Amino acid sequence: MYIGPYQLSNNLIVAPMAGVTDRPFRTLCKYFGAGHAVSEMMTSDQTLRMSKKSLYRANFDGEIAPISAQIAGSDPFELAEAARYQVANGAQIVDINMGCPAKKVCNKLAGSALLKDEDLVARILDAVVAAVDVPVTLKTRLGYLNGHENIMRVAKRAEEAGIAALALHGRTREDMYLNTARYSLIKEVKQMLNIPVIANGDIDSPEKAKYVLDYTGADAVMIGRAAQGRPWIFREISHYLATGTHLAAPNIQEVKDVLLGHLSELYDFYGEYSGCRISRKHIAWYTKGLRSSNEFRQNMYKVESTAEQFNVVEDYFNQLLAQGEIMSDVQVEQVNLLETK
C-alpha cells in the first residue's frame, strides 16, 4: 500500500491514540510488525506549540519512516500553519483529525464535531492540502449522529481535495466506542473512492483483521486499543494473513522482556517524573489478566520513582516465572473471545 510516494511495508497501521501513541509506543509497534504508525494528535493552536506536552508529541527523532503527524483543530488557517510546522519538524505525512469523539475536543468544534459542518470540513481539507507538499491523510468517523451519517459526502469531498488516504472508524461520534463498528459503510466508501481506505474499529484479533479486509475491500486496517499492552498483535496478524495459522502467544518471559524494554524507553523519553506516571497505564495493560495482577497494580500505582517501578515490575514477573505462570484463565478466556469476534 502507498500513501503518496511512500510504500508501506504492510497494511497494518497503528491508530493515533492520545496519551498512548508516543514515539516509544510507535517504535515498539513497528518493531513488532506494524507497517505504519500515526502520532498522537497535536493541537493547531500556536500558543500551545511550545508546551511540554506538545514538544513530546512532536518528537520524531530516530523514528522509522514514513513519519506521520496528526493535527487537530477547527480553524483552516491554523491547521494549514500547523501542517507546515510539522513538515518542517520532520513529518513526511500530515494526518487531519476529524474522528476524535472526546468531549473536550468536540466542545472546541474539533475532532468528530467537525462532521456537523461539511462546509468547514471542505475548507480545512483544501487549506491543509494546499499548505504542504507532502501527502495529507484524513482520520474520521461515519458521521456525528446515528441516522445522520454523512461519510459518503465527506469522503468524496476529501478525495476531491487531494487527500492521499482515508482512515475510517466504523462508528459515529454519538456511538463513542459503544455498539459495534459498522463495516458495511466502510465497504461502501471503499467502493466509491479511488484513494486508499483504511478500516478502523474493533479490530482485535488476526481473524477479525482478515475478515474486515476481505469484507470491506479496504487497503489496510488500523489497530488501536487492541495494541495496548499487546504490541505483538501486529506480528500475530501479519503471520495469520500470510499463512492462515497462529503464532504462539508470547510466554511470561517474553512479556516481561518487552514490558521492561518499553519502560526503559519511556523513562529515557519522558524523564523521571513523567516517565514513572505515564508508564503506569502501560504496566496495567500488559499485566491485565495475569495472576494476582489486581493486587500488583494497586501496589505499583503507589510507586513514585522509575527505579523502584522497574524493580517492582521485574519482581512481579520473576514471581510469576517461579510459580510456572504461562497464561491465566482470564487471559485464555479473553483470547478465545477475541478470536470468535
Predicted feature residues:
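Glycine-rich tight-turn/loop motif centered on a GG-T
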Residues: K103-L120, R171-Y183, T245
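Hydrophobic faces of well-ordered beta-strands that scaffold small-molecule active sites
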Residues: L12-P16, A37-S39, I67-I71, V94, ...
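Active-site glycine- and acidic-residue-rich loops that bind
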Residues: F77, T140-R153
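Non-cysteine beta-strand/loop elements that form the S-adenosyl-L-methionine
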Residues: S39, I93-P101, E160-G170, I223-A226
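Alpha/beta catalytic cores of nucleotide-metabolism and tRNA/nucleoside-modifying enzymes
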Residues: G4, L8, L12, A18, ...
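Active-site beta-loop-alpha junctions enriched in small/polar residues
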Residues: M17-G19, M42-S44, A72-S74, G99-P101, ...
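A contiguous, low-structure linker/loop signature
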Residues: R84-K104, A110
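Glycine-rich, positively charged N-terminal anion/phosphate-binding segment
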Residues: M1-Y2, M17-Q92
